[in-house]
A protein has these predicted regions:
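Positively charged n-region of N-terminal signal peptides that target proteins for export
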Residues: 1-5
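C-terminal motif of bacterial Sec signal peptides marking the signal peptidase cleavage site
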Residues: 14-15
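Short, low-complexity, disordered segments immediately C-terminal to signal peptides
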Residues: 20-34
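A short beta-strand-turn-helix
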Residues: 54-73, 103
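Thiol-based oxidoreductase modules, predominantly thioredoxin-like and allied folds used
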Residues: 54-57, 92-118
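Short active-site neighborhood of thiol/selenol oxidoreductases, capturing the structured segment around
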Residues: 69-84
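Conserved redox-active cysteine motifs that mediate thiol-disulfide chemistry
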Residues: 80-94
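Non-catalytic, surface beta->alpha helical segment in thiol-disulfide oxidoreductase systems
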Residues: 129-169
Length: 169
C-alpha cells in the first residue's frame, strides 16, 4: 500500500515537472479597411426578394470603393442561415417598402454570412458576437452605428438615420 501511494505521488510530480507553460499570442484585429479577398456567400433564401439592392461583389473592398465614389455609407447585415432572428428581420423588417426604399436611396447594402469561409474574416474585422448584427459604416469601413440582435423596423430606421447623420457631418 505504501509503495502504491509513493508511486502515485511520483507520477504526479513527474507530470508537473514536464508540464510546459504555453502562451497564446492574439493577433491584433485588422482595421475595417483591411483588404478582404475572400468571396461573399450568396444571399440567404428570399433575401433578394426583400427589395434591398444588395451589392453583388465577391469582396467588401469594392463595395467600400463604390461607396466612396457615391459618397454613401454602407449597410452591412451579418447573418447566418440557421439564425431564426435573422429570418424574422428579413421577413418583418427588410421586406417593408419604406425600409428597403430608404436603404436603396441612402446606402449601399452588403450582406455577410458569418459561417461562410468568405464571411468569417469580415465578421472578425467587425468583431461580430451574435446575429443578426447590422452595422452602418462610412466608405472607409469605419463603423458609424452598430445594432446587435432582432430589432423592429422603427428601431432599424432610427439607427440608419443616426448613421446617415454621422456620415453627413
Amino acid at each position: 500500500m505504501t509503495r502504491l501511494i509513493i508511486f502515485c505521488i511520483a507520477v504526479c510530480l513527474a507530470g508537473c515537472a514536464t508540464h510546459k507553460k504555453t502562451t497564446v499570442q492574439h493577433k491584433a484585429a485588422p482595421k475595417p479597411t483591411a483588404v478582404v479577398k475572400e468571396e461573399t456567400a450568396p444571399a440567404p433564401t428570399g433575401m433578394s426578394e426583400t427589395g434591398i439592392a444588395w451589392q453583388k461583389s465577391d469582396r467588401l473592398i469594392p463595395v467600400l470603393e463604390e461607396a466612396q465614389k457615391q459618397h454613401k455609407p454602407v449597410f452591412l447585415e451579418f447573418y447566418a442561415t440557421w439564425c431564426g432572428p435573422c429570418k424574422v428581420m428579413e421577413r418583418e423588417v427588410f421586406s417593408q417598402p419604406d425600409i428597403y426604399d430608404y436603404l436603396n436611396k441612402n446606402f449601399l447594402s452588403y450582406h455577410v454570412d458569418v459561417d461562410s469561409p468568405t464571411g468569417k474574416p469580415i465578421a472578425e474585422i467587425y468583431e461580430i458576437k451574435g446575429m443578426p448584427t447590422v452595422i452602418f459604416v462610412d466608405p472607409k469601413g469605419v463603423a458609424l452605428e452598430t445594432e446587435l440582435g432582432l430589432i423592429t423596423a422603427s428601431r432599424f430606421k432610427k439607427v440608419a438615420d443616426s448613421a446617415l447623420a454621422k456620415m453627413k457631418k
